[in-house]
Amino acid sequence: MRVGLVCPYSFDAYGGVQLHVRDLAEELLHRGHHVSVLAPAEDSTPVPDYVVPSGRSVPIPYNGSIARLNFGPVVGARVRRWVEQGAFDLVHLHEPFIPSLSMLALWAADGPVVGTFHTAMERSRGLRAISPVVVPMLEKITGRIAVSAEARRTLVEHLGGDAVVVPNGVYVDKFADAGCDPRWTGTPERPTVAFLGRLDEQRKGLPILAAAVGEVLATVPGARFLVAGRGEATEERALLDRYGDSVTFLGGITDEEKARLFRSADVYVAPQTGGESFGIVLVEAMAGGALVVASDIPAFQAVLDSGSAGRLFRRGDPASLARTLVEALSHRGEAESVRRRARTTVQRYDWSSVTDQILGVYDMVLSTAHAPVREDPRSRTMYGRLRAATERPWA
């Protein structure tokens, strides 16, 4: 099968969607399919051979974060050329309804199209503003996937339609078999708690963790907090400096270091306040053997089976987080029982299972298709029609 994957977000810096697209591409290639990925990337950025860079991206505020996208008539011409030259049996778009490569590809492609929806949000001025333009395009997506119930809810409430839920994937063995790093390995006397996220994004919850550290150390004085991720977080650093070597900032870490961190830490803490549709890092931490302590946002409740495969605390409440961390660090027998349940839970998210489900959607779409993907001639006039809607405030 010839599959064209479109990632809206830049490969210059990996996030959850980029990793999902990369891993799916490599799993499909491993199974013998032909795959081409279209994604924003600078010419100087090293990318896998199967990635076709679409050019420089620009930062756009979106859903409490910064998305790096590219969009416009020049990019649109590149998308049409990629569609025409790819001779794809099927095109699979990620986040097709944000102003990005995916939206351009949806307009450009005529034929079997699958769309995956990753975003979860309560309300969006941008989605409401653009819905008159994009809702008619929904009919072009013959197979719709949402990565979680929250992502499906967002699609249904904002744009109508429906989608089958297929979760994000993780290579479980990669994390389960990673080696421990002695710098990060906890002991009964000095257990380690890991945080990973963009430090300057408030919704990732570092301020919540920073406010809880003192109370945890008052009860578990040997605890060590390992804070990984890019960003300055000046206020939080100043607050945490008072705890000396009980808190270590690791900076940005590689995928290999992330796997070792989750294999080494006793607890992984996810204090996000919202804007998460799934929680892929929770699954990675569970696969690595860390006990997950997470805020009780809907996406995290789903991943942790309502607290059976991890521990939940009240969102945005440092005192609740501190109490939950103290319990996790103090009751080691109970924590090990939770870890055992988590090891079973994560198997449903392994790429071997997730790819089977995605291929099932592909088969359904292709069973009703009358021709492979080709360029939609109407796409040559699309930019003018989209421009007015997409230049409005987004999210």
Model-derived regions: residue spans:
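Carbohydrate-associated surface elements
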Residues: A41, E150, G169
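Glycosyltransferase donor-sugar binding loop
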Residues: A41-E42, L196, G222-R237
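Acidic anion/phosphate-binding donor-loop and adjacent secondary structure
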Residues: R125, V170-E189, R237
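Conserved donor-binding/catalytic core segment of Leloir-type glycosyltransferases
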Residues: W184-K204, A210-G214, L226
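Nucleotide-activated donor-binding/catalytic signature segment of Leloir-type glycosyltransferases, i.e.
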Residues: E236-R260
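Short hydrophobic beta-strand element within catalytic cores of glycosyltransferases
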Residues: L291-A294
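Conserved acidic donor-binding segment of nucleotide-sugar-dependent glycosyltransferases
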Residues: S306-G307, R311-P318, E327-G333
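A short, well-ordered alpha-helix in the C-terminal region of glycosyltransferases
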Residues: S320, E327, E334-R348, G360, ...
